[in-house]
Curated annotation (Swiss-Prot):
TM annotation in the entry: none
NCBIfam families for the chain: ackA (TIGR00016), PRK12397.1 (NF009063)
Principal EC category: transferase
Keyword vocabulary terms for this entry: ATP-binding, Cytoplasm, Kinase, Nucleotide-binding, Transferase
PANTHER family (UniProt xref): ACETATE KINASE, ACETATE KINASE-RELATED
InterPro entries listed in its UniProt record: Ac/propionate_kinase, Aliphatic_acid_kin_short-chain, Aliphatic_acid_kinase_CS, ATPase_NBD, Propionate_kinase_PduW
EC number(s) per entry: 2.7.2.15
Molecular-function GO terms, alphabetical: acetate kinase activity; ATP binding; propionate kinase activity
Free-text function comment from the UniProt entry: Works with phosphate acetyltransferase (pta) to capture exogenous propionate and regenerate propionyl-CoA during degradation of 1,2-propanediol (1,2-PD).
Originating species: Salmonella paratyphi C (strain RKS4594)
Name the UniProt record assigns to this protein: Propionate kinase
Pathway field: Polyol metabolism; 1,2-propanediol degradation
């Protein structure tokens, strides 16, 4: 028996969706509604054989969901709203409260809204998306899938910051980590491809894109991750600085009379590859500029790789070794240059890349005699969300639900 599961990622002015047939994992359609709240919202829906695009007024998220469901019916992707057996919602922050994906109830939704202080730009609109789908599809269970939940296995010395204790006890300031859905999915696929239980592996997963994070996974548990209290911390990213000396901020604020909001803008939107290269936040553009001799672009690419290498080294020490290094995300999946730079001169760890395999994006790119497997695995957060819906809302199907 198959089930139609919808995976939803609600943004402040957008709604990204995918409809999957489970447990096969087949994508039936995917799409995006952008510029919600505007008279010229953009609607894009794609199947394997067709693509529809139009510009229409979309007043709010309720309008967006209503429009989406109307289009699915109108394009005969579904015959009835009852065809949708469950809905999985990506939620940015689960705090310490949610340690796994969970079936949405009124109390669950209220708790997600209470956690908005930890993710003020994301949790409120995630909650709104859940609320609208529960209203319009009352017979389809909703499951909340948290970016932070996979990292709730971190040990206390790993997630506590060396600040006065009250900031953790009273305000919840600690390392939470993000990209958990991606890290969980990719590590599971890796174990399937190796034919080894994840519980027997030491894995470092590099999710590299405009937002990047590294995760150390030992015996199937996240034991460290580069993003912390916010997704701004960790390694260098497209427009985010990652970790820097915190005293730089008050120094800049005093010199340039910047407000906290302006400093946040600087760290989140003007730094990283964009800030150092002066070219772009897109790795491909920076790579192209570096190939033409742009010194700052070359420096940006070197910094990007070196921050990742330093993180990998510390995680290997923490886990007492490494069985597999995995690349995923837009850059990790598509840039042979980035993968090569990250793995450069790591032969002493038993880690070496075969450049011919690397250039053709093979699944495993390590040399024949390397001790550490090096894999390139496409992430699929939507499929992971759908699998969690199957596991939690339709538990009788759990045994059928495996990574594709």
């Amino acid at each position: 028996m198959s089930y139609k599961i919808m995976a939803i990622n609600a943004g402040s002015s957008s709604l990204k969706f995918q409809l999957l047939e489970m447990p096969q994992g087949d994508m039936l359609c995917q799409g995006l509604i952008e510029r919600i709240g505007m008279a010229d919202a953009q609607v894009t829906i794609k199947t394997h054989s067709q693509k529809w695009q139009e510009t229409v007024p979309v007043a709010d998220h309720r309008d967006a969901v209503t429009l989406l469901l109307e289009k699915l019916l109108g394009y005969q992707i579904i015959n009835s709203l009852r065809d949708i057996d469950g809905v999985g919602h990506r939620v940015a922050h689960g705090g310490e409260f949610f340690k796994d994906s969970t079936l949405v109830t009124d109390e669950t939704l209220a708790q997600i809204e209470r956690l908005a202080e930890l993710a003020p730009l994301h949790n409120p609109v995630n909650a709104l998306g859940i609320h609208v789908f529960r209203q319009l599809l009352p017979d389809a269970p909703s499951v909340a899938v948290f970016d932070t939940a996979f990292h709730q296995t971190l040990d206390e010395p790993t997630y506590i910051y060396p600040l006065p204790w009250r900031y953790y006890a009273e305000l919840g300031i600690r390392r939470y980590g993000f990209h958990g859905t991606s890290h969980k999915y990719v590590s599971g696929v890796l174990a399937e491809k190796l034919g080894v239980p994840l519980s027997a592996l030491r894995v470092i997963c590099c999710h590299l894109g405009n937002g990047s994070s590294i995760c150390a996974i030992k015996n199937g548990r996240s034991v460290n991750t580069s993003m912390g209290f916010t997704p701004q911390s960790g390694v260098m990213m497209g427009t985010r600085s990652g970790d820097i000396d915190p005293s730089i901020l008050p120094w800049i604020a005093q010199r340039e009379s910047k407000t906290p909001q302006q400093l946040n803008q600087l760290l989140n939107n003007e730094s990283g590859l964009l800030g150092v290269s002066g070219v772009s936040s897109d790795y491909r553009d920076v790579e192209q500029a570096a190939n033409t001799g742009n010194r700052q672009a070359k420096l940006a690419l070197t910094l990007f790789a070196e921050r990742i290498r330093a993180t990998i080294g510390s995680y290997i020490m923490q886990m007492g070794g490494l069985d597999a290094l995995v690349f995923t995300g837009g850059v990790g999946e598509n840039s042979a240059r980035a993968r090569s730079a990250v793995c450069h001169n790591l032969q002493f760890l038993g880690l070496a890349v075969d450049e011919e395999k690397n250039q053709r994006n093979a699944t495993f790119i390590q040399t024949e005699n390397a001790l550490v497997k090096v894999a390139v695995i496409n992430t699929n957060e939507e499929l992971m969300i759908a699998q969690d819906v199957m596991r939690i809302a339709l538990p009788a199907t759990e045994g059928l639900c495996v990574p594709a």
